[in-house]
């Protein structure tokens, strides 16, 4: 990617009030990673993430907030650059606790000239690498949903597979199947190595919230923080929403 072109996007670290960021960061306990007696422990901290860590306190690994701010701003910068170039961004979350958070974020950023979609709770293997086949399957489901969803709801029919598919793909629109996404924003990378591997095989960059035990291999733009903190995930999404709205007006 052209670094000179990226630098044209007007999003800088100066957009942040650093003191307020660090206050919000610690309030959300985003700096408190997993418990570990040894910062380099294979069980609790991944070697590739050690450079983002300060040390241990009360058996908790502490993530360096200065590193988080630097990497977070860089990630927002990249997201803004892709949006400005009219690229497609896919948000992936398979944590049910964050499902409503992702849905609310999506509804708040529905803009005609911005292509952002999401997969919630369940990832379909081969979604990126077997794109055409998976898209056909999802489009078949969508056609079924358009025709029978009202009937299923009105008659309170127990249809677990339909419910699971609906939950997973309600963040996708027909126009999202025109081509593969150009950038992935991954909420919980520890549970989704297969998503990263698919993206890497197709040279699709990945932005991800990375904890102390996250393997950074294949993650282009890590955001160090406690991935179990819903407040921190919400904070990240709020800033991404700002970038999306800014991009839509340029």
Label for each model-derived stretch:
Residues 2-226, 230-250:
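Ribosome large-subunit tunnel/peptidyl-transferase-proximal elements
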């Amino acid at each position: 990617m052209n670094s000179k072109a990226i630098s044209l996007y007007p999003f800088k670290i100066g957009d942040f009030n650093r003191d307020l960021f660090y206050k919000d960061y610690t309030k959300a306990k985003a700096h408190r990673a997993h418990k570990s007696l040894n910062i380099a422990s294979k069980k609790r901290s991944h070697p590739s993430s050690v450079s983002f860590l300060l040390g241990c306190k009360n058996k908790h690994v502490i993530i360096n907030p200065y590193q988080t701010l630097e990497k977070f701003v860089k990630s927002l910068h990249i997201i803004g650059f892709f949006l400005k170039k009219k690229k497609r961004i896919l948000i992936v979350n398979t944590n049910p606790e964050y499902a409503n958070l992702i849905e609310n974020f999506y509804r708040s950023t529905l803009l005609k000239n911005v292509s952002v979609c999401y997969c919630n709770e369940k990832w379909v293997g081969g979604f990126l690498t077997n794109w055409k086949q998976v898209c056909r399957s999802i489009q078949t489901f969508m056609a079924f949903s358009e025709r029978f969803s009202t009937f299923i709801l009105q008659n309170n029919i127990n249809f677990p597979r339909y419910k699971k598919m609906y939950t997973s793909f309600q963040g996708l629109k027909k126009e999202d199947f025109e081509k593969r996404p150009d950038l992935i924003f991954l909420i919980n990378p520890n549970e989704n190595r297969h998503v990263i591997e698919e993206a890497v095989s197709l040279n699709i960059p990945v932005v991800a919230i990375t904890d102390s035990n996250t393997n950074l291999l294949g993650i282009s733009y890590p955001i160090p923080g406690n991935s179990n903190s819903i407040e921190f995930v919400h904070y990240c999404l709020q800033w991404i929403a700002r970038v999306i709205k800014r991009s839509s007006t340029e």
